[in-house]
Regions:
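A short beta-strand segment in extracellular, disulfide-stabilized domains
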Residues: 27-36, 111-120, 194-204, 278-288
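Proline-enriched interdomain boundary motifs that mark the N-terminal boundary
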Residues: 9-17, 93-101, 177-185, 261-269
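Solvent-exposed segments in extracellular or luminal domains encompassing
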Residues: 56-69, 140-153, 224-238, 308-312
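Interdomain boundary/hinge segments at the C-termini of tandem beta-sandwich modules
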Residues: 2-8, 86-92, 170-176, 254-260
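Short, solvent-exposed loop/linker segments at the N-terminal edge
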Residues: 19-27, 103-111, 187-195, 271-279
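Short, exposed coil/turn segments at beta-strand boundaries within extracellular/luminal domains
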Residues: 24, 77-83, 138, 161-167, ...
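Solvent-exposed loop segments of extracellular immunoglobulin-like
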Residues: 37-45, 121-129, 205-213, 289-297
Length: 312
């Protein structure tokens, strides 16, 4: 007698170790064909062969340029065949854009920039690495806080789940130190209503968009402008606080001196004169207070040698 064994039908399943790969050279996947039934030994033929390191083995490495469906044909020792398919998806190119909420920061501690990176393409599961790390709160964060001491270009390397990488950069400018210089058109004023001083504050450095606040506000036309008019009742030291758009501040001071009240006492060398030509009197005035640099005007001018001098 002869016994003829009928083997189970030949079947095959196909799979990919990673069904989604990236476009970078290091991102590949391993295909696998698992045959059952039929009669050993099996041979394998994968199509298309494009992107495969060897289309005639059970587990080729696949690196297609675009999404591709691979079909494997398995042939057993009897010449029976079975087929299966598997699709390897190719993710779009990994790209990244780096941004900051403030491209120019100040030198004061409260002025910082918040960085951010938006990644797209590749396979999600991104990791981040910012460089240089100096001035960063966390170089591995998607959104670190940056406080560089000088203008710095930060570059972030984004790595996706396939190990593909891309980079993006953003510049954080550091403004010069904020300073303010103050001056007055007159540092010594009198008590009369018309005597006042124009104050001036000139800010530099920092980031423009300055605000001003003078103190004390007493005697100022407007304490919240750069150049108020000052009319203090007594000698006063004014301090201006300048704040830039980053919230950094600088101060400077000046003193407006208020002279004592101006007073004058007039005298005559002879309060009683005669009518003869040789009889005359010399007038004089003693001035105190105010600010020296006095001018004089006597009236009436009748009978005076010069009404515009101190001692006519």
């Amino acid at each position: 007698d002869i016994t003829v064994n009928v083997v189970s039908p030949l079947t095959v399943t196909a799979s990919a170790a990673d069904p989604l790969i990236g476009t970078c050279p290091t991102s590949t996947t391993t295909l696998n064909a698992v045959a059952l039934g039929g009669e050993l030994n099996y041979t394998y033929n994968w199509l298309p062969a494009t992107g495969l390191d060897n289309p005639s083995i059970q587990t080729p490495t696949a690196k297609p340029a675009v999404t591709t469906t691979y079909t494997v044909t398995v042939t057993d020792n009897n010449g029976c065949t079975a087929t299966a398919t598997v699709t390897v998806n190719v993710a779009p190119d990994l790209t990244a854009v780096a941004t900051t909420d403030d491209g120019t920061i100040g030198t004061c501690p409260t002025s910082v920039a918040h960085l951010d990176v938006t990644a797209s393409g590749g396979e999600p599961g991104y990791t981040y690495l910012w460089a240089p790390v100096a001035g960063l709160s966390d170089p591995n964060s998607k959104t670190p806080t940056a406080k560089p001491s000088a203008t710095t270009t930060y570059t972030v390397t984004v790595t996706d789940a396939n190990g593909c990488q891309t980079t993006a950069s953003v510049v954080v400018n550091v403004a010069p130190v904020l300073t303010v210089a103050v001056s007055a058109d007159d540092y010594n004023i009198g008590t009369c209503p018309s005597s006042d001083a124009q104050l001036t504050a000139i800010a530099s450095g920092g980031e423009p968009g300055y605000t001003y606040l003078w103190s004390p506000a007493t005697g100022l036309s407007d304490p919240a402008i750069a150049n108020p008019v000052a009319k203090p009742a007594v000698t006063t030291t004014y301090t201006v606080l300048v704040t830039d758009i980053n919230g950094c501040t600088a101060t400077s001071s000046l003193t407006i001196t208020v002279a004592p009240v101006l007073s004058a006492t007039a005298t005559a060398s002879d309060p009683n004169i005669g009518t003869c030509p040789t009889s005359q009197s010399t007038l004089d005035v003693i001035v105190t207070g105010g600010e020296p640099g006095y001018t004089y005007l006597w009236s009436p001018s009748t009978g005076l040698s010069d009404p515009a001098i101190k001692s006519p």
